[in-house]
Amino acid sequence: PFAIDDPNGFNASLSVPTRDFVHRFYQNQMQIDGGRNDKFVAYTDAGALTMGHYDGSKLPMWPIAREFTLADHFFMGAFGGSFLNHIYLICACIPQYPHADTSPAKPTIAVVNPDGVSLALTDNSPASAIDGPPKYVSDGNLTPDFYAVNTMQPPYQPSQNAPAPGGDPAYSD
């Protein structure tokens, strides 16, 4: 672990935006590595940034945040990012996409290893995190048994998916 804002290190200001980390169902399990918690750098595309932290005490609202912010005390009920965890928080269930293998969502079905918890790597995936981020056969939003475990966009607007060119503006492409 290292301080991102350490004057003797990277010295990145608190105002400098950094990239987001991978918050996905299978990668989260691969990062946790059976409870060893030693693969966070290996299964991300952010490299060692996952090991960095800021000295939050320099923030003007630090005293308030220390007392009233949950921060790391959100105990997620499911692996991965906020999509699945928000749904799980409300209903303790995982959304399903019935018959996904015969639907337009078929390309978003993840390809996993026989262990069922790790994504299958391509033949040209780097052997080490030092050589680059892993490459997956299919890092999909759906499990092979059609559970929706990563962020999916609605088929209508508003959506992160823009409408199809020349199509109905009420729908996503």
Please annotate each region the language model reported.
Residues P1-D173:
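N-terminal pro-sequences and low-complexity stem/linker regions of secreted or lumenal proteins
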